[in-house]
Amino acid sequence: AVDFGEAIWNPASSSNYSTASNQTSAVIMHTMEGSYAGSISWFQNPSAQVSAHYLIRKSDGQITQMVREYHQAWHAKNHNYYTIGIEHDGRAADAGNWSAAMVNASARLTKSICARRGVNCASAWKGPGYDTFHLVPDSVRVKGHGMLSGNENRYDPGKYFPWSNYYNLINGGGGNP
């Protein structure tokens, strides 16, 4: 069963996440740094020791859920117990990575998570993206992997992620979601 109606269920290996309860209060954006199919395969490999709740394909916005929202995916180190992780197809350093199909699907998903899990979408980051680690306040509840303490070696989803547009999409400011 999926937690978001548009998603396809394709479970991660049970070795790659925790069944401990997820006390969701934030949503974290990632880039796969590879392909959609390759990331699904990797999360199903028992030796990977990594997962995310959702993966989104760039070409058409297809959403795959791999970990139930009430479980802890392993995507953000010591922040896993309270976050939902969304992986986006492609690479953070690719200026052309953010297709409308993928961004709109991600925004619909995030808006749904916020509504169902009590996360305030208005607390999303709406500033610039970064090509280095950039810590933002804990009060920002929808943000990038490279904006979380303990993840200083990360910068995804990168400087090209359309944060201002995304903020508008998840807060009712036009677009498809």
From Swiss-Prot:
Optimum pH is 8.5. One of its GO terms (biological process) is peptidoglycan turnover. It catalyses: Hydrolyzes the link between N-acetylmuramoyl residues and L-amino acid residues in certain cell-wall glycopeptides. Keywords: Antibiotic, Antimicrobial, Cell wall biogenesis/degradation, Disulfide bond, Hydrolase, Secreted. It is found in: Secreted. Disulfide bonds join 114-121. Its EC number is 3.5.1.28. GO terms for molecular function: N-acetylmuramoyl-L-alanine amidase activity. CDD domains: PGRP (cd06583). Pfam families: Amidase_2. It is an enzyme of class 3 (hydrolase). InterPro entries: Amidase/PGRP_sf, Amidase_domain, NAMLAA_amidase_2. The keyword Ribosomal protein does not apply. Residues 23-158 form the N-acetylmuramoyl-L-alanine amidase domain. Gene3D superfamilies: Peptidoglycan recognition protein-like. Its main location: secreted. SMART domains: Ami_2 (SM00644). GO terms for cellular component: extracellular region. The keyword Secreted applies. Transmembrane segments: none annotated. PANTHER family: N-ACETYLMURAMOYL-L-ALANINE AMIDASE AMID. Antibacterial activity against Gram-positive bacteria M.luteus, S.aureus, E.faecalis and P.acidilactici and Gram-negative bacterium E.coli. This is N-acetylmuramoyl-L-alanine amidase A. The gene is cwhA.
